[in-house]
Structure formats: structure tokens, C-alpha cells
Design a protein with these regions (language model features):
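Short, strongly hydrophobic alpha-helical membrane anchors
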Residues: 1-15
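Hydrophobic alpha-helical membrane-embedded segments
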Residues: 19-46, 83-97, 128-151, 198
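Membrane-spanning helices that line or support transport/gating and their immediate boundary helices
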Residues: 35, 39-44, 151, 155, ...
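Membrane-interface amphipathic/juxtamembrane segments adjacent to transmembrane helices
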Residues: 37-75
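Solvent-exposed, non-transmembrane helices and loops of integral membrane proteins
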Residues: 61-69, 154-185
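Transmembrane alpha-helical segments and their cytosolic interface motifs
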Residues: 71-97, 124, 128, 185-214, ...
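Cytoplasmic juxtamembrane regions at transmembrane-helix boundaries
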Residues: 97-112, 148-166
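Alpha-helical transmembrane segments and their immediate juxtamembrane interface regions
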Residues: 103-144, 205-241
């Protein structure tokens, strides 16, 4: 056995096999649901697909308006959500990095919690690093959503006078498709960040035991599925004209 293979086996022994299985279930649940939701939205009206339809209708209405101040205010209000979450995520990441600096004391504190699994400081650090990685991903998605809303504001700012559309020099439908798609992409990025927040709650279960980690992952995926495809607000939006 060469040195590389030996090191690989040594890395695998850092975590017990139940923890490795729980990690695999976590990533399959997260990535798998993201792929499933995207493909399902193409054939079935999900919450995101339905709101994208309304975004396109909104952009189509802007082509008829002479004064578009209200539209600019709406875009600004929409961009405040990813901005708030991005700022909050930075604070969370900072707190988690601070925990890494006192991992031994934190690991001892976690051991005193009822039903919490007794682990070494190294394993505790790995759990904190995973949680930190989840929030780092969320931060990137929130900031990208914020930038995309900025791009959407630019598209609206470059919108010609409504008389240009009336004369047939530009197509209302093409503009609505383009601008609505930009707004939809911003919403999708924001949705990815929120999904990461949900998955972070599943990671918290890992501090108790691998079983709670798996149960938390399954529970979060179920909640995400119900809200995206079977929520009350989706039924209302789909029933609206």
C-alpha cells in the first residue's frame, strides 16, 4: 500500500462510519433536492415558478407606464432581504470562527447537553467547519442575489419610453421576458441562500448524534418540499388570474 492510500484511509478513520453515512445523506438530501426542485419546476408550478410568472407580468406592466417610480421602489424593497441576510450571515460566520478558537471548551460544554454524543475536539471542529461552510455558501448566494437585483434595476432604468413600445419599435413581450428572467434569477439565488439556512438546522443535529443529523436532514427536506410545492400561498397564487 502506497503512502497516498495510507493517508486516505487515515482520513477516513477520523470520523466513525455512522458520521460518514450521515454526511452522505446530508449532501445527497441538499444537492438532490435542489436538482429535483429545479427540474420539477419545469413541469409543475412550484412557488418559485409561479412567482416568476408574476415577475414577468410585472415587467410587462412597466412597459405601459409613463412614470415608473413605484417599480423602482419595489426593486429596492426586494433587494433589502438579501442584503439583510448577507449581513446577518457574516455575523454568524464570525461567531462560528470564534468557536473554533475555543473548540476544546465548547466540545466539553456540548458533552454536558443531554443526548449529545461525546466526541473529540477534532471531530467537533469538523462539525463547526461544516456549519461554517454552509453559511459561507449562503453568503455567496445572498450577495449574488443582491447583485442580480442591481442588474434588474439597470434593466428597468434603461427601459425606453412607453411610446416606443406603442410605435412597435421594441417588443413588450421580449422586454418582459428578459427583465422578468433577471428578477427571477435574483429570486432563485436568494432562495438558494434561504435553503442553506434551513440545511444549517440539520447540521446542528450532528452535534447531538449522527441519527439526529439524518432525521434533521430528512425533516428539512420535507419542509422545503411542502412549502415549495404544496403550501397554502402557492394555492392562492395559482388560483389568481
Amino acid at each position: 500500500m502506497d503512502l497516498t492510500a495510507f493517508k486516505s484511509l487515515k482520513i477516513l478513520t477520523v470520523l466513525p462510519w455512522p458520521d460518514w453515512l450521515a454526511l452522505i445523506v446530508f449532501f445527497i438530501g441538499w444537492v438532490g433536492y435542489a436538482v429535483f426542485a429545479r427540474r420539477r419546476s419545469a413541469s409543475s408550478m412550484s412557488l418559485l415558478a409561479t412567482t416568476n410568472h408574476y415577475r414577468r407580468l410585472w415587467m410587462l406592466q412597466t412597459t405601459w407606464r409613463d412614470v415608473r417610480v413605484v417599480d423602482g421602489v419595489i426593486v429596492q424593497n426586494l433587494s433589502t432581504s438579501p442584503s439583510f441576510f448577507a449581513s446577518t450571515t457574516i455575523l454568524i460566520i464570525g461567531g462560528l470562527l470564534a468557536v473554533l478558537g475555543t473548540s476544546e471548551k465548547a466540545a466539553v460544554l456540548v458533552k454536558e447537553i443531554p443526548f449529545a454524543a461525546a466526541t473529540s475536539a477534532l471531530v467537533f471542529d469538523l462539525k463547526v467547519l461544516l456549519l461554517t461552510g454552509v453559511f459561507v455558501y449562503a453568503f455567496f448566494r445572498f450577495t449574488w442575489s443582491l447583485r442580480q437585483y442591481t442588474f434588474g434595476a439597470l434593466v428597468m432604468g434603461a427601459l425606453p419610453d412607453f411610446r416606443v413600445f406603442e410605435r412597435g419599435e421594441l417588443s413588450r413581450e421580449e422586454y418582459a421576458d428578459r427583465a422578468g428572467r433577471v428578477m427571477g434569477l435574483a429570486a432563485e439565488s436568494f432562495n438558494d441562500g434561504l435553503r442553506a439556512y434551513y440545511m444549517a438546522f440539520a447540521v446542528i443535529g450532528w452535534f447531538f448524534s449522527p441519527l439526529w443529523f439524518v432525521v434533521g436532514t430528512a425533516g428539512v427536506v420535507y419542509v422545503l418540499y411542502q412549502r415549495e410545492f404544496h403550501s397554502d400561498v402557492l394555492a392562492v397564487l395559482k388560483s389568481s388570474p
